[in-house]
């Protein structure tokens, strides 16, 4: 029996990826304990579900602080009080400083709605369409000081269909996000994936030269 890994999740919005994590825990597929959900937005809809389940929810509104430095100092102190082994950014829409990210080096994951390194940043789906890409997807990666630049762990590929707009493409990509984020967290909790001293990903004891890719039908890569 693996001792549940203590986790803190950061969100800014609906929290659908958080819900996917909660569902995986309920299905005994994820050996973690969510100790707290923290949002930088008091109106984040994603705070409602964990609160109903008795998970601690905390709002640290970035708009209430004079600078990013002060905001992050409060955020870091709050997170560290829960002694997490992993910090998950599940739709957390704030750029974090190098100092903050370095504090959690090797134990902070993010989900991004593109096949990184392509299309980091915002407005991903429209940019994919504007570029005429035939494929998009989602990536779980370790967080480093470079925005969306940390080494990828796991990806899911999503075809771009005729007639797609940004909303339709985003919907299908989000379905895959809900699959790969809990899986990558499970790998981390089981000790299968780590960030090495040189900034590379180690998977099952060997360097991961390229991200694992979810198989058709949502099957875990062999």
Please give the residue ranges for each predicted region.
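Internal anion-binding site segments
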Residues: 8, 27, 123, 197-222
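Donor/substrate-binding cores of folate-linked one-carbon enzymes
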Residues: 24, 86, 90-204
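Short, structured coil segments at secondary-structure junctions
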Residues: 53-54, 104
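Short, well-structured alpha-helical segments in soluble
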Residues: 73-82
């Amino acid at each position: 029996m693996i001792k549940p890994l203590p986790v803190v999740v950061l969100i800014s919005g609906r929290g659908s990826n958080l819900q996917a994590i909660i569902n995986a825990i309920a299905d005994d597929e994820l050996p973690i304990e969510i100790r707290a959900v923290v949002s930088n937005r008091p109106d984040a809809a994603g705070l409602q579900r964990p609160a109903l389940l008795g998970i601690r929810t905390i709002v640290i509104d970035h708009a209430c602080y004079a600078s990013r430095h002060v905001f992050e100092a409060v955020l870091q102190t709050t997170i560290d009080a829960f002694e997490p082994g992993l910090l998950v950014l599940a739709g957390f829409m704030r750029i974090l400083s190098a100092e903050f990210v370095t504090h959690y080096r090797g134990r902070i994951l993010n989900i991004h709605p593109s096949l990184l390194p392509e299309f980091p940043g915002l407005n991903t789906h429209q940019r994919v369409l504007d570029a005429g890409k035939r494929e998009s997807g989602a990536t779980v990666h370790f967080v480093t000081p470079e925005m969306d630049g940390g080494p990828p762990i796991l990806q899911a590929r999503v075809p771009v269909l005729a007639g797609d707009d940004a909303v339709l493409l985003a919907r299908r990509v989000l379905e895959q996000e809900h699959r790969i984020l809990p899986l990558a967290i499970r790998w981390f909790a089981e000790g299968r994936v780590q960030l090495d001293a040189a900034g590379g990903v180690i998977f099952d004891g060997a360097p991961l030269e390229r991200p694992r890719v979810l198989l058709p039908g949502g099957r875990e890569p062999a």
